[in-house]
Amino acid sequence: MIQVEKTKMVDAMRSVLPGVDKGSAGIDGANLFLFKDNRLFTYNGVTSVSVPFAMEGAKFGINATNLFAFVNKLNDLSVNIDFVQDKDDPTKMKSVKVFSGKTKATFALADTSEIEKYLEGIKFTDGKPCPDNFNDAFALAVIKNNIHPEMKGVVTTKIGDKTFIAASDKRRISVHELNGDMDEFKVDDDVLADALKLGKPKTYAIVGPWLHLGYEGDVTFSCIRQDMSKFNAPAMLAAMDKLYAIEPVVEGKLPKSLSDAIGRVSALAGTTNTNTGLTVQLTFSKEGITAYTEKNDGNAEELIPWDSDVKFSTEDSVQSWVSINILLEAGSKVTDFKVVMSNPAKKSYAFLFTGEKYKALVGGISVKEG
């Protein structure tokens, strides 16, 4: 019989729940707690979360939802665990009894062969320090609602002696400088968002195809890295630097009421093409930004006055169609912006957002397509 503290067991199970929350019907064992090698594992087909948990070397799998719900409701401070042997084969376990005080439950053991096969490649090693602004940098750099599967995700990339985290959806490049060195990798942004729910990672390690993020209490979040070959981050950053060097035609801070106004006129927003989704035409003038949308036989517009000083270096009309989702997402993160003429021949403009260590490029759509 094994006796463990209830609090420690509940904390351990709770810390690995991100590995079962999204389960995977295609993998047997995606809904399990796997106890193996004195660690507790979960794996949902995409990510694995594990934490040290002494179980005298025993290996077994139990339905995660049921075990967590039962142990979490126990009143006593300790939990007892006993293994029931198979009568026909004493070398095998048939079930596990979990009891505390006068409350007891028996859990059938699950087949863990498939989940163990996927976890064979996981090898733990001493991690390198993770930059202290990694979570904040990801929150700013990530691009939500990315409609291009091959671009979806975030990458870390090195330019000179600096490391950046970057994302792109072909119409926008979003970049944030990290406060420290980090090896290069690409991971799915939804997966990384789950990892950061565990808190701020202290260490990271790349072992084979896996990225490991280490947290307090020796909790480890593991996920499979993605192919970086279609994400040329250095070229993207070079393109951004080139645009930032252009003299802006408009420069200032976005009006605080821009988001609400865009929300109102978006009711009549149409789709420009498959790369953009819903679009809005922005016209920059000294009075403010005029947001205009059209769909079928209707249209809507609203003038959003400036609420701070804005610099203009041209008397020409500065006007372009922009993806609504991209504009709102970038504008919700930083309010400082520049507008530069990216292609004088076509009179197309690029919108540049700038924070202390954050930059984002939002490409304009110079010709409205049907």
Descriptions of predicted regions:
Residues 1-370:
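Structural preference for solvent-exposed beta-strand-turn elements
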